[in-house]
From Swiss-Prot:
Biological source species: Coxiella burnetii (strain RSA 493 / Nine Mile phase I)
Cellular component aspect of the GO annotation: small ribosomal subunit
Ranges of residues in domain S5 DRBM: 13-76
Family, as annotated: Belongs to the universal ribosomal protein uS5 family.
Complex and partners: Part of the 30S ribosomal subunit. Contacts proteins S4 and S8.
GO molecular function: rRNA binding; structural constituent of ribosome
The protein's name: Small ribosomal subunit protein uS5
Cited HAMAP family: Ribosomal_uS5_B (MF_01307_B)
One Pfam family it belongs to: Ribosomal_S5_C
Task of the protein: With S4 and S12 plays an important role in translational accuracy. Located at the back of the 30S subunit body where it stabilizes the conformation of the head with respect to the body.
Xref: InterPro entries: Ribosomal_Su5_D2-typ_SF, Ribosomal_uS5, Ribosomal_uS5_bac-type, Ribosomal_uS5_C, Ribosomal_uS5_N, Ribosomal_uS5_N_CS, Ribsml_uS5_D2-typ_fold_subgr
Length: 168
């Protein structure tokens, strides 16, 4: 597994390489290697996406993953530099728990989740991965959780109540 730093492109989207895997196919003449790359991309203001790319060469796999990440971005409502509420989500046997944190806490999370929060613009969060720590499953579980994020305004509108009643 390899890691790379955050790269910012001209359009302001940050990209971070989370994992690179090597696979081998055994053929008559020996082994043929392939690579898969997992990349997260975000604008630093609540938009984030992830992509998986596969190719025979590492740079090609990273390029494909980056394109997929940019194509599949979601918008997550943030509360300043943290989350609105605690979230628990599961994908396969990876369960992630994300909690909002007070100012100055920083990003306390595992490698795969840390990359997501950094490119998304979250600066204060507590996150824990329970069960499998497979980076692909952790990223998918994190995205499932982030899709569940709701603002107090949207919760109040769904319940037909005033925001003051919800925030209590």
């Amino acid at each position: 597994m390899q890691e790379a730093g955050i790269g910012t492109t001209t359009d302001g989207i940050q990209e971070k390489l989370v994992a690179v895997r090597r696979t081998a196919k055994v053929v008559k003449g020996g082994r043929v290697f392939g690579f898969s790359a997992l990349v997260v991309a975000g604008d630093g203001d609540g938009k984030v996406g992830f992509g998986l790319g596969k190719a025979r060469e590492v740079p090609s796999a990273i390029q494909k993953a980056t394109e997929n990440a940019r194509r599949n971005m979601i918008s997550v409502p943030l509360y300043g530099a943290t989350l609105h509420h605690a979230i628990k989500a599961t994908h396969a046997s990876s369960t992630v728990l994300m909690l909002p944190a007070s100012e100055g806490t920083g990003v306390i999370a595992g490698n795969a989740m840390r990359a997501i929060f950094e490119v998304m613009g979250v600066q204060n969060v507590l996150a824990k991965c329970i069960g499998s720590s497979n980076p692909i499953n952790v990223v998918r579980a994190t995205f499932k959780g982030l899709k569940q994020m709701e603002t107090p305004e949207s919760v109040a509108a769904k319940r037909g109540k005033a925001i003051e009643e919800i925030v209590e």
